[in-house]
């Protein structure tokens, strides 16, 4: 994917793909990135290494650090994300004009 194909999209995050993503299609993101994606709505357009599809923003309450340190995990969910290799690095770009998220293998 070239800079030209990113259009006016802005980088919002750099992530390492977890070992779970290829199995469940969920790419964990930060609270800040989730906040940037919220205006796109419940479902939004997604482009993963040039392949188009749809995605949803998800969140899950968690106590993985103990009950006294409850927090929330945020993620982008799509079957397209299953194509990402665990341990690979990806960059997330938000194209606000096209109302879509681009995920590009770094």
Where is each model-derived feature located?
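Acidic, low-complexity intrinsically disordered regions
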Residues: 1-106
């Amino acid at each position: 994917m070239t800079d030209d194909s990113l259009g006016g999209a802005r980088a919002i995050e750099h992530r390492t793909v977890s070992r779970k993503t290829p199995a469940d299609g969920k790419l964990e993101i930060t609270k800040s990135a989730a906040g940037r994606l919220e205006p796109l709505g419940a479902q939004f357009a997604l482009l993963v290494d040039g392949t188009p599809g749809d995605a949803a923003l998800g969140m899950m309450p968690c106590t993985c650090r103990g009950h006294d340190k409850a927090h929330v995990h945020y993620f982008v969910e799509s079957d397209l994300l299953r194509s990402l290799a665990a341990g690979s690095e990806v960059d997330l770009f938000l194209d606000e004009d096209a109302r879509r998220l681009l995920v590009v293998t770094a």
